[in-house]
Structure formats: structure tokens, C-alpha cells
Amino acid sequence: MRSTQTYAAEITAPISSSSHGEWQAWRSKRAFLARASAPFEILETLRLKDGVPHNAVRHLMRMAKAAAHFDYPFDRELAVTTLARLAASRPNGVWRVRLLLDRSGRLHAHANPIPPSPQAILLQLALRPLEDAGSEFVRFKTTRREHYDCFAPSDPRVFDTILWNERGEITECTRGNLAFRLNGRWITPVASCGLLPGVEREVRLADGSLVEGVIQAADLHRAQGVAFINSLRGWIRANVVGLDSPC
């Protein structure tokens, strides 16, 4: 069983059933309009090393969940075959693989070489919250990334941006998840804060090297360590620029 640590107090106000119904109707309408505004594909990005796709089973499971959520046809056996063919054509080296599923159920994959991951990176804290961090386009990985693109660092030395929600809780980066060393443990933001549950994050939660918790942006200076994590690059030590006390 996963343990969850909380580093923030939450206060909620009662909501009437009629107000709740109106809220849910508004959310459903907004989600419909967001989906209809532009076509998108479901996406998985994974590491291929010497012909072996990293965590392929977990990536395909996540794609299947996204396909079910968006009502996209998904043929798992075809996805396995598509990945296997691509892997066989890249028997050597390290590659960034993008596996995409469109609305009609068509799958395609392509690979690009990736340079070695840096030993450490710089991250910056977003200046404003990510609105609607609970959006389906945050919780599921797709080619719709406008909500992330506007947080791209302008400084070329900065690798990515640390996002936070409207409650002031840290969520993720635009290209991966986060871990913070607090009170002697590595904590990753809990999924309910509004983030994409990454495959590498899930692996480390399962093996016990990470636990979930709520981390306030205002408390970042207390972290004894920071790491950026994703399935493509693994675990990378990070420093956060612009804080009074470096992490």
C-alpha cells in the first residue's frame, strides 16, 4: 500500500447538491468543447536502448487507459507489433520513441536519437498557477500541449518549469514528474494535485523509493534535494533557480 504524506492543510466548504450538479454540467460542457476544438492523438514517449523498449508494458497499459477515457479504439496486440517492428529496426543506440494513437484507432511510431542525459539540470518555478490542473489533458498524455507550452523556459540554461495549481500545490514539470527530499524521504506530488502520472514515477512508487505527498510551492526552500523524473531520462538531480535557499 502506498503511503501519502501531506505537507499542507486543506480547507473545504460545503457545496449544495444543486450547485454541485451545475458545476459538473459546466465541467462536462467545457471538456466537450476542449476535445472538439482541435483533433489530438494519444501519446506515449519511451526510451529504446539497444533494441529494447523501456517499461513498454506500463506504457501500453497507460495508453489503453487513455484510449478508454477518450473512447479511442485501441488494439493492444497491434501496438505491441508496432513497437516490436520499430525496435527491430533500431538494434543499437538510445532512441526517443513516440507511439501515437489517433481517433480512428490507427497507430504509428517513430524514433529519434537522444543525447546522454545530464547529471544535473536547472528548473525554474512557474510565476503563475496552471489553471484547471485537473483537466483530462493533464491527467492523460496527448498531443494537446498548449497548457504546457506557455510555461516553457525562456532561459536556455533552464531545463524545465515546476508547475503548481491554484491551491499553491506543486504538481509536475511540463516534461516529467518531480521528487523532493523532505524529512528524510523522497516525496512526489500526489496525483490529485493535478498531474500526469508518469511511468517512471509509478515504478518508483511501486518499489518504495518514492511516496506521495502534498507539497506547497511556498515550502520548496525546505527541500534537501530535488529530482526530475520521467521514463525517457530516468532520475536527474535538479537545482531550482530563483529561490532564496538553493535546493
Language-model features, listed with the residues they occupy:
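Helix-start/capping segments and mature chain N-termini
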Residues: 19-96, 100-247
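Conserved, well-ordered active-site substructure
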Residues: 1-14, 233-240
